[in-house]
Amino acid sequence: MKKIACIVAGLFVALTMAAQTKVTWSMELGLGMSTWMGKDAGDSSPLFNQKVGVGIDVPLSGLVSFQTGLYWASKGASIDVDYVGANTKNVVDMHVNQNYFEMPLLAAFHVGTAANFDMVFTAGPYLAYGVSGKRNIDIDDLTVSYNTFGESKIDGEIVSGLRRFDAGVMAGVALDFKRWTVGLDGEFGCCKLASNSKTRNLAFFFTAGYKF
């Protein structure tokens, strides 16, 4: 709860800043791929995922602005895991879906062009909190599904969930038109997804936004 409070407090500060200067609000949609990285990521494969939310651009000078907002971001990966059943042991494919509320805290650098748009380069940290998700394992004709975050009970055993809190670094580039933006964002997680694993999130999204 303390981590959620910190995220909400950060957004409140951004909104307070927005009330004191001329800002740009936008609705944004991103489509892309996510996977895991790190020593224990193994042969993880990417999944198609998306994010959607509200963005805020707060001008600091003619060339620099502060960008934040609140997004629903889906991440995850497909990975091979060992499954031990009653009479067998198999390597099976597990799809992990992780849904976060995510808040970026970015410095944006605006570069004018001869055309009718600006180039915008962004970089900075992000904070995220996992709110939902499922882990699905296909075993022959059977699908075993349990929660991504929080504990689950399978065959009488308690299975730990992934850590809810995530933070990392974002970087991106976008074309900024009068009413629209299009761009590419990369998100590189710095927090371990579980206490006994060194895997971290990795995601790339093509984004489009409408400014109002």
What does each model-found stretch correspond to?
Residues 20-53:
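Short glycine/proline- and aromatic-enriched beta-strand/turn motifs that initiate or cap beta-hairpins
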Residues 74-81, 157-160, 164-212:
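Predominantly the C-terminal beta-signal and adjacent terminal strand-loop region
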Residues 1-28, 208-212:
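Bacterial Sec-dependent N-terminal signal peptides
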Residues 35-46, 75-100, 130-166, 170:
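Extracellular/periplasm-exposed beta-strand and loop segments of Gram-negative cell-envelope proteins
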Residues 28, 40-45, 115, 193-201:
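Solvent-exposed loop/turn segments connecting transmembrane beta-strands
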Residues 20, 61-63, 73, 112-116, ...:
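Outer-membrane beta-barrel channels and translocator barrels
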Residues 27-33, 52-60, 70-72, 103-109, ...:
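Residues on the lipid-exposed face of transmembrane beta-strands in outer-membrane beta-barrel proteins
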Residues 21-23, 46-50, 97-103, 117, ...:
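Residues that define the transmembrane beta-barrel architecture of outer-membrane proteins
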